[in-house]
Amino acid sequence: MIVQHKTAKIEEDHGLFQPILRPSDISKTTDTKFIQSSPYIEKEHWLDLGTLSVGHYFLSLALQTFVPKDSVRYAHLPYAQAFDIAEIVNLIREYSHKYHKHIPAFSAYIVAFRSVLQPEVQVSPEARHKLAEIDKGSHLEANVSGGLLKYWYGIPDDVFGQNLATCWWTSKESARLGGAGKIHREGLKAVRGWYKNWKIEEYELEVIEGGSSYIFKGLS
């Protein structure tokens, strides 16, 4: 028999499964220097497009549409099934046409954090809010560090408390530097015991020059 622990709802859960930008709205985008690249709407969390190469510039724009294909089962599915990687690459091509710029060969480093909360944490609004605060502070540190193209996190499911959060980076080195901030390091230590289990998955997206094809592969 599966014991169901109802996940506590918090304000930070709002709108997580709604994309920042829908694929159909690409024609409405304008040339801008900063974009929202995470669930956080405050401007200090926005991504500075001026720091990016052409390939990563197009990728970051495409990732504004990034949400799971299945908002219920995403945390239980393999990454490439949970998210539509082909659609992201297709949008890279669309942005290339829109801005009349060639797509160079480039790659991105992706991290997925899969976790299952302890039942007493899962049902506690205070505990979930604390985790959300650590996430937000860690994102700001990583954004200042540079190279973080996208951050998205979901909501622990009611049955298992299982969840998935993911980051897209320009490189593995950017991810290493971005995860070295004080809030991130100390936050992990403070809440390590709040998880029944967790694991890290690593992936790479390699886009071929011109964007005609791509390779998405696991690194771990």
From Swiss-Prot:
Principal cellular location given in the protein's record: cytoplasm
Top-level division of the source organism's lineage: Eukaryota
Compartmental location: Cytoplasm; Nucleus
Keyword vocabulary terms for this entry: Cytoplasm, Nucleus
GO cellular component, one term: nucleus
Family per record: Belongs to the UPF0643 family.
Protein name listed in UniProt: UPF0643 protein PB2B2.08
